[in-house]
Amino acid sequence: MPVNPPPTTPTDNLNFNKTVEFKFPQELGKPPLRKGVAPKLLLGHLVVLPIYLSGGTPMGGHDGIQEDLLIVPQLLDTTPDKLNLNLISRHPDVRLTYNTLKLPYRNIRRKAEEVKGIPGVPVTLGRERRTQWHNVVFQDTVVKRHLNPVVQDLLKLRGAVRGETDSPWLKRGYDPRVADHIHYGQLVGKTHNAHIRLPRKVVEEFIPVPGKSLIDLVHDNYHLALRGPFPNLLHNVQEPKTASGGPGNGRCDLVGSAVRNDILNYRVTGVLLEFVDHILRRDSLPRSWGPYNQQVGWGGAVEDVPQVLADSTHLFLSVLQGVRHKERAEDIPVFEKSRSLLKHLQLPAIQLYNSKPHFYM
């Protein structure tokens, strides 16, 4: 199955201090999920990824940031080719370029909420029109015809985040590498750790998907620009034993607090290594360790992990971190039981999300 071409933006656009380039659809009425739009948005800045998947800000509580941006032409009295969207600073804003007119995102959202939907315009910002757009996007014919495989995978992930029980994406034949992993990569459900296992849906339908599908967005040497925290995660998550030889409470230096080692070992380290193993096999990279075994752990030294895997893993962890900050349980009921795990994934590169007041716009 074909994948997206290499990104045309500079690799340092992936830095968390940069703004994101939002490219408007060719027609104002075209849904922003159509082919060719979403990958450019995702590769522009990883912070936008959880926004795109959940339809809200990194802190949750808002529906449809991309639709909000469609109000900009009315505010500017022109339709720009692209915008620079900054969601990192204390006061998020939108600019035509780095040195021109700046529109506070707070004002854009306020104006967007006033729009009730214009007859004859396929995509507007009103709630009724937003529902119509959602129904159109999720029709089989539209998905197959207009969405590339990566976007289909992302939509499936969004379904898992929202707690949807139906899984039609497997039937639609999205990226077979993801499908195989979901069917055969059993990361939970073993009897030896049944007392701590998370819902199978979480691990099978959420955790493996973003890393395995989004990594295909990174081609050639672009992945070398993604300095990920994978080695640090493995080094800092220890597994000290109790006097009886069983798993004890370890310390994760990434968050500076005591954590359950059995959970971290099987849920965090295990999932990451499974993902890394897939990247190695897909790219035919050498492996100096054996396959991951949930019962005995990883059959190799941490020092053997190639840096290329650490680089690639940044995509995976960014998705996980973005979902972690959905505060309201009703938004993502399927993750309610896994919240104790996800709260320990505060990685140094993503500490900007901790400024909660700045993201409630």
UniProtKB/Swiss-Prot annotation:
Tree of life domain: Archaea
Assigned keywords, A-Z: Plasmid
Protein name in the entry: Uncharacterized protein ORF8
